[in-house]
Amino acid sequence: QNSIIGQGLQNHSAGGLIQTEISNGVTLYRNLYIDNKTRNPKVKGLNQYINNVIYNWGNGAAYNMGGESEGESETTIENNYFIVGPGYNYIGVEQANGTVETIFESVTPTKPFTGGNSSFRTYWVGNYYDSNKDGVLNGHLMNWDTDCSGNPTFL
């Protein structure tokens, strides 16, 4: 809790992989996930994801609901704020002389919630999404049908 999880290495820019047993979970509370391309975090098992801020996740997943993998998950996802940032990836381009030049490629971010199947059960409430990049914190209460993807079971 109360941590900054950011700037994952660019060839594997991930915020975290959290897997627990359904009988013994983890709480992710009041964290700032910033500049990670994906897995902010990717979760399976029993977890609470409450009062976090997720900024600039690029074209990976802001919150990955266990992907399409098997296994039971029960989650509480409550009062988080997802803010779209400039969104870019580093790309190494090999030059004619054999050196590698790093360039930036602009990307379109994914929807904040991705993955998830009927084995991923969630209580989901009070999450906000600010997608307009205007520099003002003025997001809207998230709507699953328009702001998210995946097919979890809602509790």
Model segments located where?
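Long, contiguous C-terminal flanking segments immediately downstream of a protein's structured core
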Residues: 78, 82-155
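Extracellular beta-strand/beta-solenoid scaffold signature
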Residues: 7-21, 35-39, 58-68, 91-113
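Right-handed parallel beta-helix
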Residues: 1-39, 46-59, 73-86, 123-130
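Generic marker of residues within folded, mature protein domains
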Residues: 31, 67-70, 117
